[in-house]
Design a protein with these regions (language model features):
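Active-site-proximal loop/helix of nucleotide/amide-processing enzymes and allied scaffolds
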Residues: 2-20, 42, 67, 77-158
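Long amphipathic N-terminal alpha/beta scaffold segment
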Residues: 17-75
C-alpha cells in the first residue's frame, strides 16, 4: 500500500491507520475479477486508490472483457520521477495473454500535474492504433496526479 502523501494536511496516527485499513478493503474488492469499469469514474477511483502518492512514474493497464469487467490489472513499466518508457509490443502481448476485449491505459505523474505531455499524446495514439489492429478497444487513457485524474476520453483525445 502506498503512502498517504496525497492527503492534504496533517492526520493523526489513528486517522492514518483507519484510512489505510479502508484503502486495503477497497483495494481487495476492486482487485476481484469481474469488477465492472463501466465508466471513467470507476476506473478513476480505482487508479487514485492504487497510484496516488507513487514517487516514480508507472504505466499500468487494466484488462477488460466485453462487458468492461476487470480481468486483470498490472504495472507494465516503471520509470523515473518524470518519464516511463512504454513499448506497444509488450502492451499488445499482455492484452492478448489476458484475452482482453478492451484495455484502460493509465500512468501517473508524481509531480501532481495531470496535463498530458506531447509524449503522452503520441504514445496514446500509437497504442490505440496498434491495439486496434488486433481488435482491442482503448476506452480511455488516464493520468493520475495526486487525487486528480485527466481522462483522454473526456477531453476528446481518443
Amino acid at each position: 500500500m502506498q503512502q498517504l502523501s496525497f492527503l492534504p494536511g496533517e492526520i493523526t496516527p489513528g486517522e492514518r491507520s483507519l484510512i489505510q485499513r479502508a484503502l486495503k478493503t477497497l483495494d481487495r474488492h476492486l482487485h476481484e475479477p469481474g469488477v465492472a469499469f463501466t465508466s471513467t469514474r470507476a476506473a478513476r477511483e480505482w487508479l487514485i486508490l492504487n497510484m496516488a502518492g507513487l514517487e516514480r512514474e508507472e504505466f499500468r493497464v487494466l484488462y477488460l472483457n466485453n462487458q468492461n469487467q476487470l480481468i486483470a490489472g498490472e504495472t507494465l513499466f516503471t520509470g523515473t520521477i518524470n518519464r516511463t518508457e512504454v513499448h506497444p509490443r509488450e502492451v499488445i502481448k499482455r492484452a492478448l495473454y489476458h484475452n482482453a476485449a478492451a484495455v484502460v491505459l493509465a500512468h501517473n505523474h508524481p509531480s501532481g500535474e495531470v496535463t498530458p505531455s506531447k509524449a503522452d499524446r503520441l504514445i496514446t495514439e500509437r497504442l490505440v492504433q496498434a491495439l486496434g489492429l488486433v481488435d482491442i478497444r482503448v476506452p480511455d487513457h488516464l493520468i493520475v496526479g495526486g487525487s486528480q485524474v485527466f481522462s483522454f476520453a473526456e477531453h476528446g483525445l481518443l
